[in-house]
Amino acid sequence: MSGPGGANDIIARTVQRVIQQRKLVDAPLAIVSKVGAGGVLGWSYLNQHAGDGGYISISPINLLTEHILGASPLTYTDVTPIAQLFNEYVAFVVRADSPLRSGRDILDKLRSDSGALSFAVAASLGGANHIAAVLAMKNAGIDVKKLKFVVFTSGVQSQTAVMGGHVDVAAVPVSGVVPQVEAGRLRVLAVSSAQRLGGAFASVPTWKEQGVGSVFSSWRGVIGPKGMSAPQVAYWENVMARVVESDDWKKDIATNFWESNFMTSAESRKFLQAQYAEYKSVLIEVGLAR
């Protein structure tokens, strides 16, 4: 789903490391990177091995959004959901000397003029960071069709644009902003989680605390190819349950400010169905989907 060093690659290697260290499967695990087309190449490769329990993949929200946007013929109903692993939240950051001091300041500015501020998002409209911003503003009663978004290829570029004064606000994964926040170059005005995060974000209020009933996570799960048998699904479901119970995994969860949110295969399917409907509604509202 992503190249070496990308978010999904890192997650896949973390899962691989825990499985191998704890000897949770009998055979060695190999990472195969299939990069491009927003994840479509990876899911297509997965389905070339239909019914084969030897192939699994990390699944990000792109599995849903690329289909909603019309960029992918495949979605969660075309593969086999195995488990959900964790939630990753989005931080809304500004330059350290920005006159915007809170999430409420963002909302007040946009309520008077929906196009008054520019938002940096990566890596595409319709992606996790974009949806997080749209949902928060929508729930605050702001006309999301008039919001200004500037798309960058990475969260690092989004942060650089904010620090350079080229964009007012960046919506970025929380784990990626810690270095610039601790260096005093960026301030976090809100996070998209239901409750406050710890560590560097302990003093940062959620959108809910600032009067906006918006919670959003860029989750990660595990899928297999279409046509997997019930025993194959149960096997990998059990492996993933043991992964998330390990101390190594819990350490990675804490380090990256992720929130463990394990779901079984059946629970994952229901979750993905609900998420698909929510994302489709949002993307239709901003004119990116029908």
Annotated model-derived regions:
Residues 1-78, 125, 142-168, 262-263, ...:
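N-terminal (or domain-start) structured segment
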Residues 21, 45-54, 67-157, 207, ...:
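Hinge/capping helix and adjacent helix->loop/strand transition within the periplasmic-binding protein
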Residues 35, 116, 121-124, 128-203:
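Ligand-binding pocket segment of bilobal, Venus flytrap-like solute-binding proteins
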Residues 176-247, 274-277:
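C-terminal lobe and pocket-closing loops
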Residues 3-5, 61, 95-100, 122-127, ...:
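Short coil/turn segments
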Residues 7-11, 15, 38-42, 61, ...:
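Stable alpha-helical elements in mature extracytoplasmic
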Residues 230-290:
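An extracytoplasmic/periplasmic, membrane-proximal ligand-sensing/linker region
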Residues 19, 23, 33, 50, ...:
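Sec/Tat-exported extracytoplasmic proteins
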